């Protein structure tokens, strides 16, 4: 499969198309009812301003910038999401590896792009979705107790990297495009978290970390680690 074959060159993410159209029509009907239904126009103006603000926030949330990494991807791990680095630590990974791994976590706020990218080139070895809670995504337990999707990728060098999409207090739906056996590449979308919240990347111990705590990341652009 070509490197850019699955890359969707769109400005609004496909996961947001139906939501944005439905929201636009609903807000239009509400504002039309207020405008034509009451003589006093003050409530209409207040609701109209609020409607525009809410809709612009939703458009911002579902935006889908076209990004190409543009550099050599060998042994490179890129940020799978826009956001802020909230965890860099060794942890026990008990779903797939059952050993110690280096975990780098990116928290996405409501104003971040919520499309997720593959962090490495490789072949998809495992995809799993787990139902769970919707506690705040920055809490340590969120990684194992919240609703989440796990994708394991084996790089061309034979290194396995686990990426976990995690829903938060607001997020209620995780979308994952990965399928076992497919090849995946940096520059391609791995999925989308609707109104949520965190992505964890599990790497082998000894991996060179290229980011710091609190650093802001740009999905598919920021190099977060280099594999040995």
UniProtKB/Swiss-Prot annotation:
Please list the GO terms describing molecular function.
Answer: phosphatidylserine decarboxylase activity
Signal peptide interval? none
Among Pfam families, the record links this protein to: PS_Dcarbxylase (PF02666)
Active-site residues (renumbered): 197 (schiff-base intermediate with substrate)
Which keywords does UniProt give here?
Answer: Cell membrane, Decarboxylase, Lipid biosynthesis, Lipid metabolism, Lyase, Membrane, Phospholipid biosynthesis, Phospholipid metabolism, Pyruvate, Zymogen
Question: Can you summarize the PTM annotation of this record?
Answer: Is synthesized initially as an inactive proenzyme. Formation of the active enzyme involves a self-maturation process in which the active site pyruvoyl group is generated from an internal serine residue via an autocatalytic post-translational modification. Two non-identical subunits are generated from the proenzyme in this reaction, and the pyruvate is formed at the N-terminus of the alpha chain, which is derived from the carboxyl end of the proenzyme.
Its quaternary organisation is: Heterodimer of a large membrane-associated beta subunit and a small pyruvoyl-containing alpha subunit.
Q: What is the name listed in the Swiss-Prot or TrEMBL entry for this protein?
A: Phosphatidylserine decarboxylase proenzyme
Gene name linked to the record = psd
């Amino acid at each position: 499969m070509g490197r850019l074959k699955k890359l969707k060159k769109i400005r609004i993410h496909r996961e947001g198309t139906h939501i944005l159209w439905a929201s636009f029509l609903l807000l239009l009907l509400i504002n039309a009812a207020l405008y034509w239904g009451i003589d006093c126009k003050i409530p209409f103006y207040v609701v109209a301003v609020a409607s525009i603000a809410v809709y612009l926030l939703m458009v911002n949330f579902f935006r889908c910038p076209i990004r190409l990494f543009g550099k050599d991807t060998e042994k490179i791990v890129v940020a799978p999401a826009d956001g802020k680095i909230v965890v860099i630590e060794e942890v026990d990974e008990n779903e797939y590896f059952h050993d110690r791994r280096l975990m780098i976590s990116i928290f996405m706020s409501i104003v971040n792009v919520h499309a997720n990218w593959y962090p490495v080139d490789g072949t998809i070895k495992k995809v799993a979705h787990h139902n769970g809670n919707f506690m705040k995504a920055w809490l340590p337990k969120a990684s194992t107790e919240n609703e989440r999707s796990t994708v394991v990728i084996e790089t061309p060098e034979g290194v396995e990297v686990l990426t976990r999409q995690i829903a938060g207090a607001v997020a209620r739906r995780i979308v994952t495009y990965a399928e076992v056996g497919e090849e995946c590449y940096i520059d391609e979308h791995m999925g989308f978290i609707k109104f949520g919240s965190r992505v964890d990347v599990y790497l082998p111990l000894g991996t060179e970390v290229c980011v710091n705590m609190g650093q802001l990341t740009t999905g598919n652009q920021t190099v977060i680690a280099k594999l040995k």
